[in-house]
Amino acid sequence: MSESQDLPGAIVNRIIKASLPEGVLCAKESRLAIAKAAKVWIHYLTAASIDFSSHSGRSTISPKDVFQAIEEIDFENFKPQLEEYLAALKSEKEKEKEKEKEKEKEKEKEKDSNKDDTKSKDENKSSKKSSSSSKDEK
């Protein structure tokens, strides 16, 4: 595990700070140890997840693989919280998709109304031209 695979220090520090009770500090060496432990745990969970995906004949790790791996490495107490997070994430993505669809519909309506405005302006211009040319003929 090279240094290029280290977790971002600022993020690790933010997580540690949020986890500590008020008034409790964490030594720099402790922060480094926590970051290294988190990195090892990520590698371990990833390897276990890969096992489940490859047994299913897939090369992509799915959430199902991660949940199975969590159970296998005896961290099933994390599973309910992660399932809630995944459900919330999916819900949020659906809402974003709906908002994008609404924006696209609004853009289409604007385009249509702009086309209608352009057509009516063109019709007005051509009717003015024809009325002015008929006046000229008189």
Curated annotation (Swiss-Prot):
Chain residue ranges for the region called Disordered: 91-138
GO molecular function terms noted in the UniProt entry: chromatin DNA binding; protein heterodimerization activity
Keywords, alphabetical: Coiled coil, DNA-binding, Nucleus
GO cellular component, as recorded: CHRAC; epsilon DNA polymerase complex
Keyword Cytoplasm: no
GO biological process terms on file: DNA damage response; heterochromatin formation; leading strand elongation
Its biological purpose: Accessory component of the DNA polymerase epsilon complex. Participates in DNA repair and in chromosomal DNA replication. Forms a complex with CHRAC1 and binds naked DNA, which is then incorporated into chromatin, aided by the nucleosome-remodeling activity of iswi/snf2h and acf1.
Subunit structure: Consists of three subunits: pole, pole2 and pole3.
Name by which UniProt lists this protein: DNA polymerase epsilon subunit 3
Lineage: Eukaryota, Amoebozoa, Evosea, Eumycetozoa, Dictyostelia
